[in-house]
Amino acid sequence: MYVSPTMTGEGAAFVYNGYNEWCNPYELSITLNGELKTTDHQVVTSLNVAEKIDLEGDGKICPEINQFTSDTFKATNGDVLPYASFTPEKDDKKNALVVWLHGAGEGGTNPEIAYLGNKVTSLISDEFQSNFQGAYVLVPQCPEGYGWPVDKDGNYTSGATPSKWRESLFELIDNYVTSRPDIDANRIIIGGCSNGGNMVYDMVLSHMGYFAAAFPMCHEFDINTVTDEQLNYLKTFPVWSTYTLGDSSSYKGSIPIVEKMKEIGATNFHYSQFDNASDVTGRFFGDPSDPTILDTTGTSKIPLQYDGHWAWTLF
């Protein structure tokens, strides 16, 4: 059935109530009324769709669910963090670890949301895994509130004050590493989108020397909050930042950092800047007069344009 991420009423698996949740119960009533085409524009003549489906946790929407393991971690301060993880095939060698920090929409107590909300499953794809010859993937989930960049008083922070989750999150990551001897402690890479991108910088700069590289996206971390020591550390620390010019967050976080890294002559800072967040799958196209509207004619070759904040779709 031809649908797109921008359409409404098409039976989305998630509902958004401040953050994403499984649509449960998931019930559909679908009838064929007029011409319907598949994604390759073949005409559908009949439908046979179950009216009630239990989507949660069984791989119906995304078979990769079955490759992740979910658990919880209790930190020494009492924080309980849900997380999901992927284990590569045993190969008698050290493996890298990739840590993903979700955005505001994927918090809660079901880590499936944290790795499905932004297609983090791409990190376990053959294409991505081949770059590391197999890598562990760890997806922590912030269990409450607005998400990772919140200080001890419950206020949003872009770096001026430390995240209340800083130490419990680091403890989870470090415990995961030390309990798996085949993880290469010299190849721990951390990335994340939106407020997860804020937290990437919080973690890197509060535990300098621990992470090997970082890949933040579409964040609002304020480079003006860092110390001279931290700024000097970033001068050589490997970072690849991704953002769009169509995202207001870019002008608070990503772009000022790019400018500062150029100013100080950073030697290992890289970035991908896009005009907007357009579809890269080749499946969805926009109306020629307005690419933010889905083209249903099958004739447009202009990629569908998403919200400018969705830089993770370009990763």
What positions do the PLM features span?
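Gly/Ser-rich "nucleophile elbow"/oxyanion-hole loop immediately N-terminal to the catalytic nucleophile
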Residues: E89, K93, D151-S194
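Primarily recognizes the serine-hydrolase "nucleophile elbow" in alpha/beta-hydrolase
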Residues: T178-S179, A185-Y233
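The conserved beta1-alpha1 loop
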Residues: L101-G103, C218, Y243
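Active-site machinery of serine-nucleophile hydrolases
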Residues: L97, A104-E167
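Short, solvent-exposed loop/turn and secondary-structure capping segments
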Residues: G108-A114, W148-D153, D202-M203, V226-T227, ...
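A domain-start/cap signature at the N-terminus of enzymes
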Residues: M1-L97, V258-E259, F269
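Short, proline-enriched alpha-helix->beta-strand connector loops that line the catalytic pocket
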Residues: Q133-A135, Y233-V239
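C-terminal catalytic histidine-bearing segment of alpha/beta-hydrolase fold enzymes
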Residues: W240-V258, K262-F315
